[in-house]
A protein has these predicted regions:
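Active-site-adjacent structural elements in enzyme catalytic cores
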Residues: 1-344
Length: 344
């Protein structure tokens, strides 16, 4: 299969991508979060191609992307008032809402569940593609399953060239981590995955919000996952990742002491000079968490090489968007965290 490269700047791109989706093909689409691997979310055969291309477990549900917020009524029932409030405030945007699924949504799309995640992405090109296709687009992140997500079209081609019909190049993704997922079928609402819409922002609308245990710790492999990213290995390069927490000085002392040639250090820009001789790479500034979010998967993919035996990673602390970066890094590390403050 030849994978078509479709620049978002080309006026024919949206029509071409929409035609492929209508005909049951796979198109990688840009969003503000990460690139998605899209198919007609109502076509079971098309959706099955996503799982094959990614090597994705069948019980890992997909998110339906819509062109307009009101379209959630086409695919969900018993929609609570909170969903409309969230959509009004945050859509188009990096928020997925879990709702009871209508029968029109195939079980292959929902991972066998009675619920479905719906999102209206903040990318004009992709919304136009969805509108022209006339179908909701089921789209997980466009990386090989378990690997770091794709935030450029070149990342997508690295993983899927020759395996999918087309990739739409919309440039580098602005947010850089997958959407926030909130489950409105639970009372109180439950955060299943942090992202560009923060828990603090959600609480302003919802009042009360609980955080699923899978966000901060490994999930029981037998537990049903209601959203992507809740179980299975995610976001990981080939080398084991170890998060080193603690003060800047303590962490640097620990890493410099145990560092072996060939290993890499993934740190903040402000820390680069502390790791001279340890082959450091910065993924953003500690004092600007948006740069960490935008640069996270760029660096994890850069470190996804067979000749790197280990990656030491520094992780931001605190809430807001930093909470989402923590979640992705901890999952990439398999929750392997060493507190340098506790090392004598």
């Amino acid at each position: 299969m030849k994978t078509l490269y479709l620049p978002a700047s080309d006026p024919q791109t949206c029509d071409a991508a929409a035609k492929i989706l209508r005909e049951g093909g796979l198109v990688a689409i840009p969003t503000e979060t990460v690139y998605g691997l899209g198919a007609n979310g109502l076509d079971e055969a098309a959706v099955a191609k996503i799982f094959i291309a990614k090597g994705r477990p069948q019980d890992n549900p997909l998110i339906l992307h819509v062109a307009d917020p009101i379209q959630m009524e086409l695919f969900a029932h018993d929609i609570p008032a909170a969903a409309y409030l969230l959509a009004e405030k945050f859509w188009p945007g990096p928020l997925t809402i879990i709702l009871p699924a209508k029968d029109i949504v195939p079980k292959r799309t929902t991972g066998g569940l009675s619920t479905v995640g719906i999102r209206c992405p903040d990318n004009e090109t992709t919304r136009e593609i969805i509108r022209l296709a006339g179908v909701p687009v089921a789209a997980p992140s466009a990386n090989n399953s378990g690997k770091p997500s794709t935030v450029t079209a070149q990342h997508v081609l690295h993983d899927h060239d020759g395996k999918i019909n087309a990739v739409v190049d919309g440039g580098h993704c602005r947010v850089g981590v997958e959407s926030t997922i909130v489950d409105l079928t639970e009372r109180p609402p439950r955060l299943l995955r942090p992202g560009g819409i923060t828990p603090e922002q959600l609480k302003e609308v919802l009042g009360e919000l609980t955080v699923d245990e899978s966000v901060t710790a490994e999930i029981d492999p037998n537990k049903v996952a209601k959203a992507p990213g809740m179980k299975y290995l995610h976001y990981a390069p080939q080398a084991p990742v170890v998060i080193i927490s603690g003060s800047r000085e303590k962490a640097a002392d620990y890493i410099r002491h145990f560092y072996q040639p060939g290993e890499r250090v993934m740190c903040f820009e402000e820390e680069l000079e502390l790791y001279e001789g340890c082959d450091p790479i910065a993924y953003g500034r500690e004092d600007d968490v948006a740069t960490l979010s935008a640069g996270l998967f760029d660096v994890l993919r850069e470190l996804d090489k067979p000749d790197i035996p280990r990656v030491y990673a520094r992780c931001p602390v605190g809430g807001g968007l930093a909470f989402a970066v923590q979640n992705r890094l901890k999952k990439a590390a398999g929750f392997h965290i060493i507190d340098a403050e506790e090392i004598e």
